[in-house]
């Protein structure tokens, strides 16, 4: 019995070992990038702010400052994955604007169109997040943070 278990173990090692060398993950050879979770290719990343699954693809949004390796005006970065292992960076999802930086939040796929944003049969992806106005904060105003919505009909 032990020999059968050992033989099965060896066969499994051979099978799985042969597929490991065929990985197309570009981060495999990058010394300082983690292999077990997403990181952008460069610059500041902060907390994850929304993960949704839509049409066979996972979408991850995260606080991101694309211009430096230190904290700065927050954006929402975007990455996609078919399997939660292999990630592809996408263009930035949300940029700072006249209302301020893009802080923490969440995202949902609005299948039932409770937001009313659907158009021509396209299902909206709705992001709910905090706008942070650094000028208002410096001035001591009490309304320097506001809740905001953004949506997309892109697929």
Where are the model-predicted features located?
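Bacterial Sec-dependent N-terminal signal peptides
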Residues: 1-24
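Beta-rich carbohydrate-recognition and catalytic domains
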Residues: 22-155
């Amino acid at each position: 019995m032990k020999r059968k278990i050992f033989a099965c173990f060896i066969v499994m090692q051979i099978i799985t070992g042969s597929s490991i060398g065929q990985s197309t993950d570009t981060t495999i050879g990058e010394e300082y990038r983690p292999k077990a979770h997403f990181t952008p290719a460069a610059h500041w990343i902060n907390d994850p702010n929304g993960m949704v699954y839509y049409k066979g693809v996972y979408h991850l949004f995260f606080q991101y400052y694309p211009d430096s390796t230190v904290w700065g005006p927050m954006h929402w970065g975007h990455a996609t994955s078919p399997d939660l292992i292999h990630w592809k960076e996408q263009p930035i999802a949300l940029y700072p604007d006249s209302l301020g930086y893009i802080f923490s939040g969440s995202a949902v796929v609005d299948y039932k169109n409770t937001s009313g944003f659907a158009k021509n049969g396209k299902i909206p992806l709705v992001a709910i997040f905090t706008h942070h106005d650094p000028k208002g904060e410096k001035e001591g105003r009490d309304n320097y943070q506001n809740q905001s919505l953004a949506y997309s009909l892109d697929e």
